Design a protein with these regions (language model features):
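Hydrophobic anchor residue at the start of the ABC signature
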Residues: 72-73, 100
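Conserved catalytic motifs of ABC-family nucleotide-binding domains
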Residues: 79
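Conserved ABC ATPase signature
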Residues: 58-62, 66
Length: 179
């Protein structure tokens, strides 16, 4: 199982490459050295998240979004059958948000993700669980459960739900609240 949290601060100064190589640890015995297969897997994981040129950089010098992509690469290097994501696109520019979700979807493994962006969730998730105050309100396919009424009830905000003319996917536009 791989995990990508939303907060990934460290006190130790590891290179990006070493951070991703740590994803190989579950596959090793105590003191077992890295091998050719590990190097290839780490390189491919860095390539997937577009960070191969960052290999020698210090993890501590990276932006929040870059750190998030390193942590995803580390999880990919683990070769998990299941991935837990806690706001995986929290610090990312839009380009990388889309890239991260596309990468995760391409892994074809089980994923449990906590997301607040309902349009992204509707686009990339097969099943949604809508939670309010720690309780499951409803669950199902995004196009079956995400309604204006549900969003108003759970998030206390008005919205319009429409089909994105570019992607053909469900999208949600929120109405600005008046204060």
């Amino acid at each position: 199982m791989g995990v990508v949290g939303q907060f990934n601060d460290l006190s130790f100064d590891f290179s990006v490459y070493d951070m991703v190589m740590m994803g190989r640890t579950p596959h090793k015995n105590l003191m077992e050295p890295d091998n050719k297969e590990d190097y290839e897997i780490v390189h491919n994981a860095l390539k997937k998240v577009n960070l191969t040129t960052y290999s020698d950089r210090s993890y501590l010098t990276l932006s929040g979004g870059e750190k998030q992509r390193v942590i995803l690469a580390r999880a990919i290097a683990q070769e998990p059958k299941f991935l837990i994501l806690d706001e995986p696109t929290n610090h990312l520019d839009i380009k990388y948000q889309l890239q991260i979700f596309s990468i995760v979807k391409s892994l074809k493994i089980g994923v449990l993700a906590a997301l607040h962006d309902l349009s992204m969730a509707a686009t990339y998730c097969d099943i949604l669980y809508v939670v309010k105050n720690g309780e499951i309100v409803t669950y199902g396919k995004p196009n079956e459960i995400l309604t204006k009424e549900l969003i108003k009830s759970v998030y206390e905000i008005d919205c319009e739900i429409y089909t994105n003319p570019i992607t053909g996917e469900m999208a949600i536009a929120y109405k600005m609240p008046k204060y």
